[in-house]
Amino acid sequence: MCDPQRDEELRPVPKERAVLESFFTQLGMFWFDRAKDYVEKEKDASKSAGAIWGSLLAALAHLAAAEKAYHNMTFLGQKLGGQSFFSRKDSIRTIYTSLHNELKKVVSMGRHAPGGSTPNLEELLPHLSEQLCHFTQARMEIADFYEKMHTLGSQKTVNSEELVGALDSILQKYSSRFHHPILSRLESSFQVEVDVLTQLLRCQAQISEWHFLPSLLNLHGAHSKLQAWGQVFERQRETRKHLFGGQSQKAVQPPHLFLWLQRLQATLLAKFSFYFHEALSRQTSQSEMKTLTARTSLDYFGKISGFIRKYDASNVSLVFDNRGSESFQGHGYHHPQSYREAPKGVDQFPAVVSLPGGERPVTHWPNVIMIMSDRSTELNTLDKVVHFYDDKVQSTYFLARPEPHFTIVVIFDGRKSERDSYIVAFLQELIGSLRNSKPFTSLKPGSKG
């Protein structure tokens, strides 16, 4: 007796389905040019096939080109009208809108197609096209999101929580809207990209609130996903022939978007290592901690230590203003049900990092808090370096604020000029890096950030 299910499994895969699976596999491997050439050749070889098949292949060639432009981020920061009509590159929204319209035509053709010899194909192609319509809409919204992030690079503060909310709403809107097995590589790459970006933005928001464990979990989650994503490029080797014979293989260069996400993760790791240096130091030796922080993209601890040695600073501290923070319990991780009385007085302004000794300079702390209070308006502009000399203790204080809850304090014995260009430049560079908005500027290829 025949088993219908087994017969179905053994039946050869229709050629069209095999072409589609091969195309989306190539797209999932980020072989954009190869995928485009593949469907264009298939279209030329299938001119006698039905109109709906030819139309879908043409749309898929445009999809490969759109995905290449998207992942290389070449659309960011384009000025409309800045180029001549013939040389102006279409915006990413224009490209995906045009693609969306092509796919809608395929859907419409499928609805009006007469019953033919391949009814399954006549059903499959419009169904895939409909799901790809949702995908192109999702891409347009994420591209708009990157445009917004790019413009935020020039601002003093970035509301990461607001960005996470916007990203979450896009994800919920398009969740399971392009779920066909043939599109699984496309769906997977979309999901990983949005997950990584969400976790990194959440991490940025949580570091700014000095929340150790949530920051750590999001940073680790993004790192793990980026590593898995990076394996796709590591496994791809391209052969290069040398001028005088011989050849070598090297990993394929990942697209700009992936490299940018890696850089954002690296800058957040550096900031995390600095803000939570005390908690992390408890897990290893001092020499090992020094080695580990030196490997970060920006070694804040080493940079500040070098500044102290060169300019004979008495102390550099990162002060956390925990007023209004109900969850504040001090360095590291604390059990959710553990109770600790809310800090009062000077304890509302702990030095979460203090160099060179690791302990805040107690005798100077009332002065530090007084300056932070009296000069709060200047500090809240987030680009002002505040100077104060106290004749009684013969000490000079420089203060600057990278973000609302944190203030960098530099203390010198004796008098220092408020016009000391090196000290001011050092602090401005430091708070600019800690603000972590520069990576948003570098979203655009060729930008410094």
From Swiss-Prot:
It is found in: Lysosome membrane. Gene3D superfamilies: 1.10.3450.30. Keywords: Lysosome, Membrane. Its main location: membrane. InterPro entries: C12orf66-like_central_sf (IPR038060), KICS_2 (IPR018544). SUPFAM superfamilies: FLJ32549 C-terminal domain-like (SSF160651), FLJ32549 domain-like (SSF158548). Pfam families: C12orf66_like. It comes from the Eukaryota. GO terms for cellular component: KICSTOR complex; lysosomal membrane. Disruption phenotype: Morphant embryos show edema, otolith defects, impaired left-right patterning, and reduced ciliary length. GO terms for biological process: cellular response to amino acid starvation; cellular response to glucose starvation; negative regulation of TORC1 signaling; protein localization to lysosome. As part of the KICSTOR complex may function in the amino acid-sensing branch of the TORC1 signaling pathway. Belongs to the KICS2 family. May be part of the KICSTOR complex. This is KICSTOR subunit 2. It comes from Danio rerio (Zebrafish). The gene is kics2.
